[in-house]
């Protein structure tokens, strides 16, 4: 068995984008619960959730344009975009800039996520009913 070393971290959470920002907000006790904006919650018992806040660089919200083109974003569910963002942050945090193909092939990123792609799962289930 080989040893693994964690050399960099990246975070995209409802509290924000980036390890330092999320950590600062955690220490301050900031809540990320807001009114649901991604869908109409009127059929549910609550209208609040902790969504990833989209925005631009000026408001400390997640700017998807920094991580993926709009053309590519149309092809994937948001959770893929979130993983790309966090993985890119982790590689940059590690200061990892490999020059050789061999080093690129030996690079790995571990991603943790609850569940993703629910919109696509729901859409596909309607097609096959």
PLM regions: where:
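Conserved "HGTGT" condensation-loop signature of ketosynthase/thiolase-family condensing enzymes
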Residues: 1-127
């Amino acid at each position: 068995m080989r040893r693994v070393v964690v050399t960099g971290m990246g975070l995209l959470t409802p509290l924000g984008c980036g390890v330092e920002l999320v950590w600062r907000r955690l220490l301050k006790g900031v809540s990320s619960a807001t009114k649901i904006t991604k869908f109409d919650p009127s059929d549910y018992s609550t209208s609040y959730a902790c969504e990833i806040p989209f925005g631009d660089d000026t408001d400390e919200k997640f700017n998807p344009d920094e991580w993926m083109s709009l053309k590519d974003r149309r092809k994937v569910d948001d959770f893929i975009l979130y993983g790309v963002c966090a993985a890119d942050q982790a590689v940059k945090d590690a200061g990892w800039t490999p020059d050789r193909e061999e080093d690129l092939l030996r690079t790995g990123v571990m991603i943790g996520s609850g569940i993703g792609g629910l919109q696509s799962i729901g859409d596909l289930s309607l097609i096959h009913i």
